[in-house]
Amino acid sequence: MSDFSMETLKSLRQRTGVGLTKCKEALEHAKGNLEDAVVYLRKLGLASAGKKEHRETKEGVIAASVDEHGAAIVEVNVETDFVANNSVFRTFVTGLLSDILNNKLSDVDALAQVTSSQEPSLSVEELKAVTMQTVGENIRISRALYTPVNSNQSVGIYSHGNGKAVALVFLSGSDKQEALAKDIAMHIVASQPQFLSKESVPQEVLEREREVFSSQLSGKPQEVIEKITTGKFKAFFQETCLLEQAFIKDPDVTIQELVDRAAKASGEPLKVEHFVFWKIGA
């Protein structure tokens, strides 16, 4: 039976910001004495990390990875760009990708509780506290996403600005089109589309744009309004929809045409299934 109450355990967590497992270990070692447990955690280099958790985190890195079963992307924030480029911090982020892939997780809270692939004696939350102690700044795992990948898909990853913006592209019809998928991912980072296709634009967005166009054309004949509105929607789709955009490396070709050409050349039914685009803080 434990020599401490749940209230003591809660107090230790609130005071130090250290994970549940290590707090239990500390209280067991200290036979339920709160102050001794704090000292125990300080000796492990964990306790002082909790003091940093209120600090604002505006910098950071986005990282992505893929294995044979899925793709992972994670955003981790810190206080300064200096630490965002620190090798210890970067190693922690790389480990998170393995944890996401191994556990197939998109929930940050659930991710915090799994055993770290980098340090099996610690949870992800506890390793985060150790890393905070090492780099001297608050660290926040802001978001994570796991996407399953099948044997007939190619995944492209492109990172810009040392992890300030990252795109993932999922291309179906072949597992040998990583170069094409990466080219499209690079295009996404540069052009920042909001939607995959015209068909994927939400109805409320279309209605909003139509209202804007109508207001701009107030007083004109209906047939003129309809003609101009059609042109404005074409421009809107070319600006916001990935498949309608001009390819950044060859503006005479849209992304859809780029994929169609590759499909014809390879004899494979290629299709952009979806994409993910993240920017730091966005």
Curated annotation (Swiss-Prot):
Its chief place of residence is cytoplasm
**Entry superkingdom:** Bacteria
Q: Say which family it is in.
A: Belongs to the EF-Ts family.
Kindly list the GO CC terms recorded for this protein. Answer: cytoplasm
Q: Which GO terms describe its molecular function?
A: translation elongation factor activity
User: What CDD domains does the annotation carry?
Assistant: UBA_EF-Ts
Please name the source species: Chlamydia muridarum (strain MoPn / Nigg)
Report the protein's function. Associates with the EF-Tu.GDP complex and induces the exchange of GDP to GTP. It remains bound to the aminoacyl-tRNA.EF-Tu.GTP complex up to the GTP hydrolysis stage on the ribosome.
Subcellular location(s): the record lists:
Cytoplasm
Which keywords label this protein? Cytoplasm, Elongation factor, Protein biosynthesis
What Gene3D superfamilies does this protein map onto? 1.10.286.20, DNA helicase RuvA subunit, C-terminal domain, Elongation factor Ts, dimerisation domain
Q: Organism classification, top ranks? A: Bacteria, Pseudomonadati, Chlamydiota, Chlamydiia, Chlamydiales
Q: Where is this region: Involved in Mg(2+) ion dislocation from EF-Tu?
A: 80-83
List the InterPro entries: EF-Ts_dimer_sf, Transl_elong_EFTs/EF1B, Transl_elong_EFTs/EF1B_dimer, Transl_elong_Ts_CS, UBA-like_sf
UniProt-recorded name of the protein: Elongation factor Ts
